[in-house]
Amino acid sequence: MGGLRVDLSGAEIRVDPACGAAADDGGSPPVFLPRQPAAPPLLALDIGGTLIKLVYTASCGGGGAELRFAKFERRRMQECFDFVRAQGLVHRNGSTMGSSKENIALKASGGGAYKYTEDFREKLGVCLDKVDEMDSVVSGANFLLQSVPGAAFTHMNGKKSSVDISPNNLFPYLLVNIGSGVSILKVTGNRKFERVTGTHIGGGTMFGLAKLLTGCKSYDEFLQLSQKGDNFVLDLIVKDICGELVCQKQGLSTSTLASSFGKVITSKKKLTDYRPEDLASTLLSAFTYNIAQISFLVASILHLRRVFFGGSYIRGHKSTMQNISYAIDFWSQSKMQAVFLQHEGYLGALGALMSYGDSGDKNMNLEEMKEEENIHESATPIDETSTDEHNDGNIFPYLLVNIGSGVSMIEVTGNGKFERIIGSHLGGGTILGLARLLTGCSSYDEFLELSQRGNNLAVDLTVGDIYGEHGYPKIGLPASTTAASFGKVSSSRLSEYKVEDLAAALLNSFTYNIGQIAYFVANLSGLKRIFFRGAYICGHEKTMDKISHSLKYWSKGQVQTTFLCHEGFLGTLGAFWSYENMGIDGLAAHEVIREVLLGAPYTGQLPSLPLTHQQDNGEDTTIEGEVERLRHDNAVLKAELERLQRENTELKAKLVKSGKPNTFYH
């Protein structure tokens, strides 16, 4: 197949297939190629961590050909082999590929192209000509955007609108590819791109947790469940914390999300007491908003206005696209636009198909790949500063990250000068809420003890699991790197997994996520120092260790990480700082301003997610909401009191022993 090419001129999407055959993947209509000459079929594959995606050509009787699409779960690889044979894709010039002395090569991208070479050779008699995954994804996206009218669209307020893309102003753009994990690439031209970052909280995380929480067997089943659910059953919103009067006084929307799964921590319900539909809805909103937030921050750092989303975990799902679109629009104040693609799950396979006929192609070997940095260098690099430079004269400006049920990030520029600039709904409430559902633990301390004895690699999918022992060196990802938190979960039976391993995976995924977002916010604001505080972090060395490691990785050691414990005790410096000389005494003292410390990542309510359960019950719901708020406040205050008592005892013991202030882990 190596000498054949695909003629893309005049390509168009046809809802009614020109060749009289429907798409093998009902959500991905064929692309008609009117000028493609009659020829044996071409087949290309993208073998990912979860799915095998196929793109192949089929000649049309009246001239031209179609690009057709099909996908299979990787664990059902035999079904893929059977399909390839049934469609006649293993024949060339009337003979079976495997019947010749030399095996025919199929273009293939993705980590599975390296791991399953022998399977394809044995079952189909073909060898896999490996194409770099990121090259393929970018090539596939550029093909759709440049050659296929109507391939790009937006989805806002339930309305899908086609986007006209001019090849003259396409570049640069940000491409967010949502697979088992998420890769974020800056594309500056044809075959010109850079993988700037990624996150291990992606489609594999959603699906893995969905299996454990809802018992669903497929991702499509999970999406169907989410459509029927209500995330407000489990999510903590601003009204639950502040009450309606404070919300009205401060001009806050009562439905502003503060903490995903945050209501679970004060509830006596067990996992079996929640509806699978509500659990699915909460999972979907939690992780789609998180992906959108990271995408917004990266686009802001790179000064990009247009963000394209692709990947097999979007699947044209309306709520997924709506959540991402709403969050991007809100954070950017309508200056950025989330754009989606037809055939978004087939970018890698399309790119591999485009590589047929490339004279410069060679079969890639992971061991020979050139390593390069996978983190984009900021336009305003953050200089490393020694920790001994902290004093009254140079402490400002800094980023204060408060980790409560949600996460709030505040820029402090001087004494009494601070502003909440962003937050995250994936905070301590999310960690403990999910921990209670998955492990049955009753407290954060118990959860941390479980995590100490667990192994996150029992459920987390690593780069090595996808690419093999050499990892993905071209973009600087060693085999040990987590590719998708909970991405290795294959069973829907929670009892098959150790609670210790689940706890370890939870702690890893969310603490690294908090660290990553904090780094991006500091980078965007040009801040060199980050102070962390909050009941879910202070005094917990395991949590501080994870966040410190995350910041060190993302910033390459150029951002200072300090933890405030017990009214501003900076243990990392062996010095005592009060909120007053940090310039935030007003923030700590005035109850009316406590909404600044909420972790809400956005404000307002999506039209597609009405407060049905709150609106239908009238006054009774208001009373129930107040009771729920009081229960939550009581639980938080009780936990805070226990923490302070424990810290006080430990501090006294260490002061007696050392004769100097305690030093916490940095």
UniProtKB/Swiss-Prot annotation:
Main enzyme class: transferase
Activity regulation as described: Regulated by feedback inhibition by malonyl-CoA.
Entry keywords, A to Z: ATP-binding, Coenzyme A biosynthesis, Kinase, Nucleotide-binding, Transferase
GO biological process, one term: coenzyme A biosynthetic process
Pathway in which the depicted protein is active: Cofactor biosynthesis; coenzyme A biosynthesis; CoA from (R)-pantothenate: step 1/5
Pfam families given in the database record: Fumble
EC number: 2.7.1.33
Keyword Secreted among UniProt keywords: no
Coiled-coil residue windows: none
GO CC terms: cytosol; nucleus
GO molecular function terms listed in the Swiss-Prot or TrEMBL record: ATP binding; pantothenate kinase activity
CDD domains per UniProt: ASKHA_NBD_PanK-II_euk
Signal sequence region: none
Role this protein plays: Catalyzes the phosphorylation of pantothenate the first step in CoA biosynthesis. May play a role in the physiological regulation of the intracellular CoA concentration.
PANTHER family given in the database record: PANTOTHENATE KINASE (PTHR12280), PANTOTHENATE KINASE 1 (PTHR12280:SF36)
Family: Belongs to the type II pantothenate kinase family.
Protein name: Pantothenate kinase 1
Lineage: Eukaryota, Viridiplantae, Streptophyta, Embryophyta, Tracheophyta
